[in-house]
């Protein structure tokens, strides 16, 4: 059915109440073109939101015209459902794209101040020159190269296949290349970088088409030789995927995560267990459990505190806003932190200075896509949250790295569950007082003024 034309929807990510801008709509249109030839149901959901944004924004004769076109479009879409529909789908997509770009939805309401920060894109994830959507993968930065590891592939009519493929994007040359595959095919892998080497310590592997189980399989990758070395598995009973993985010196911390995921019955085994692995000694340590089970949470380190932000508890509908902190010195958990402004799970998180950024995520009940557009940061120095510009293309199930002060988020899902995109989005946070200065300079000044004295005092 067509959307209710008179309904001023509250969906932020696909309405002009929170405009996406021309770049955002171009991303949506590109995604619609990609999805049309493989998944009509998902495409209809995307176009529902996009068309509703167009119609809600228009007025007078333009509104009437768009209403007629909308009804006509849905008639075409219904015809599409009856048989062979490739040509009709493509025509419908082009018409929708023209409507979106011509409707003026990119203009901000006169009473709204743009949120800070600048979004952009890098070349889409590709494999042998072909776009290669990815979700529930891990990302890692080594030097000038961003690695995308494992994850799931688009629906093939039977399952979301888990892959061991690894690709890297060179920020200098602007090219994607394939590297040596992971020894195990994993999604929700727990990945960290220590001394220029990439570690994965467990993750989820497919048992059958719709059931993923945690595994303790582990390995380390050396970019210099393009070789993987298999490591001893995680201790029995400590296997997890989707942990809030962070690194401090030689130690990789893995708080929370998933023991399993049953896609058919929407069941997830969220855990509160907490382990760490020292890459020098190759020893595992059991740490105090989290205050509550968490998976798909944001994470970050500031000074001697490990933060767990939001996430979910036993299912993607059960998102939470709590912020936990683990003191690495006292080895104790604390919970008295300002919660997330919006409960979210499946966010991509990255830390710059005292700011822990959380982008996207799923569990948004304001929209049928259930994917959040918000970019918000927790300031660990002040225990406050800061709002930034929304994502042009809201995603969940992705990961993030920081390259020279810019946050890079490759791929992810654009509809709750699994609807993959190859789009790579980047976010440049502004300086509080001047958007003209570079982020790396701000970080350097901040660390000299605040962090260096603290580090010297700690020693």
Curated annotation (Swiss-Prot):
<comment type="function">
    <text>Kelch-like protein; part of the gene cluster that mediates the biosynthesis of terrein, a fungal metabolite with ecological, antimicrobial, antiproliferative, and antioxidative activities. The first step in the pathway is performed by the polyketide synthase terA that produces 4-hydroxy-6-methylpyranon (4-HMP), orsellinic acid (OA), and 2,3-dehydro-6-hydroxymellein (2,3-dehydro-6-HM) by condensing acetyl-CoA with two, three, or four malonyl-CoA units, respectively. 4-HMP and OA are not pathway intermediates, but are rather shunt or side products.</text>
</comment>
<protein>
    <recommendedName>
        <fullName>Kelch-like protein terF</fullName>
    </recommendedName>
</protein>
<dbReference type="InterPro" id="IPR006652">
    <property type="entry name" value="Kelch_1"/>
</dbReference>
<feature type="repeat" description="Kelch 6">
    <location>
        <begin position="355"/>
        <end position="405"/>
    </location>
</feature>
<keyword id="KW-0677">Repeat</keyword>
<comment type="pathway">
    <text>Secondary metabolite biosynthesis.</text>
</comment>
<feature type="repeat" description="Kelch 5">
    <location>
        <begin position="306"/>
        <end position="354"/>
    </location>
</feature>
<feature type="repeat" description="Kelch 2">
    <location>
        <begin position="145"/>
        <end position="196"/>
    </location>
</feature>
<keyword id="KW-0880">Kelch repeat</keyword>
<feature type="repeat" description="Kelch 1">
    <location>
        <begin position="92"/>
        <end position="144"/>
    </location>
</feature>
<dbReference type="Pfam" id="PF24981">
    <property type="entry name" value="Beta-prop_ATRN-LZTR1"/>
</dbReference>
<dbReference type="InterPro" id="IPR015915">
    <property type="entry name" value="Kelch-typ_b-propeller"/>
</dbReference>
<dbReference type="InterPro" id="IPR056737">
    <property type="entry name" value="Beta-prop_ATRN-MKLN-like"/>
</dbReference>
<feature type="repeat" description="Kelch 4">
    <location>
        <begin position="251"/>
        <end position="304"/>
    </location>
</feature>
<feature type="repeat" description="Kelch 3">
    <location>
        <begin position="198"/>
        <end position="248"/>
    </location>
</feature>
């Amino acid at each position: 059915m067509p959307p209710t034309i008179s309904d001023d929807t509250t969906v932020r990510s696909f309405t002009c109440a929170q405009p996406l801008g021309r770049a955002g709509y171009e991303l949506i249109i590109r995604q619609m073109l990609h999805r049309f030839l493989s998944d009509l149901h998902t495409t209809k959901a995307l176009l529902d939101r996009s068309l509703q944004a167009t119609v809600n924004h228009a007025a007078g004769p333009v509104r009437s015209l768009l209403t007629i076109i909308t009804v006509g479009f849905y008639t075409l879409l219904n015809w599409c459902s009856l048989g062979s529909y490739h040509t009709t789908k493509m025509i419908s997509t082009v018409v929708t794209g023209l409507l979106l770009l011509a409707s003026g939805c990119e203009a901000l309401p006169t009473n709204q101040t743009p949120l800070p920060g600048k979004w952009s894109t890098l070349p889409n994830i590709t494999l042998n020159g072909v776009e290669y959507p990815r979700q529930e993968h891990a990302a890692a930065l080594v030097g000038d190269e961003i690695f995308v590891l494992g994850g799931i592939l688009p629906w093939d009519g039977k399952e979301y296949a888990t892959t061991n493929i690894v690709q890297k994007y060179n920020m200098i040359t602007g090219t994607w290349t394939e590297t040596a595959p992971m020894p195990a095919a994993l999604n929700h892998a727990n990945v960290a970088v220590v001394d220029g080497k990439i570690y994965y310590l467990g993750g989820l592997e497919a048992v059958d088409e719709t059931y993923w189980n945690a595994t303790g399989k582990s390995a380390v990758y050396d970019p210099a030789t393009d070789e993987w070395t298999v490591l001893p598995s995680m201790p029995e009973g400590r296997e997890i995927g989707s942990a809030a993985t962070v690194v401090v010196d030689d130690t990789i911390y893995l708080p929370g995560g998933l023991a399993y995921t049953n896609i058919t019955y929407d069941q997830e085994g969220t855990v509160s267990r907490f382990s760490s692995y020292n890459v020098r000694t190759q020893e595992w340590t059991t740490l105090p459990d989290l205050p509550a089970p968490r998976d798909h949470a944001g994470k970050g380190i500031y000074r001697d505190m490990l933060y767990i932000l939001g996430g979910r508890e036993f299912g993607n509908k059960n998102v939470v806003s709590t912020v936990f902190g683990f003191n690495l010195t006292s080895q104790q958990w604390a919970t008295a932190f300002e919660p997330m402004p919006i409960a979210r799970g499946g966010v991509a998180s990255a830390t710059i200075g005292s700011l822990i950024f959380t982008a996207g995520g799923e569990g948004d009940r304001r929209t049928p896509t259930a994917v959040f557009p918000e970019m918000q940061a927790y300031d660990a120095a002040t225990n406050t949250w800061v709002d930034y510009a929304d994502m042009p293309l809201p995603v969940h199930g992705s990961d993030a790295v920081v390259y020279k002060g810019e946050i890079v988020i490759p791929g992810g899902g654009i509809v709750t569950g699994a609807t993959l995109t190859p789009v790579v989005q980047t976010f440049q946070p502004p300086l509080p007082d001047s958007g003209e200065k570079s982020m790396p300079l701000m970080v350097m000044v901040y660390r000299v003024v605040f962090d260096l004295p603290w580090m010297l005092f700690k020693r």
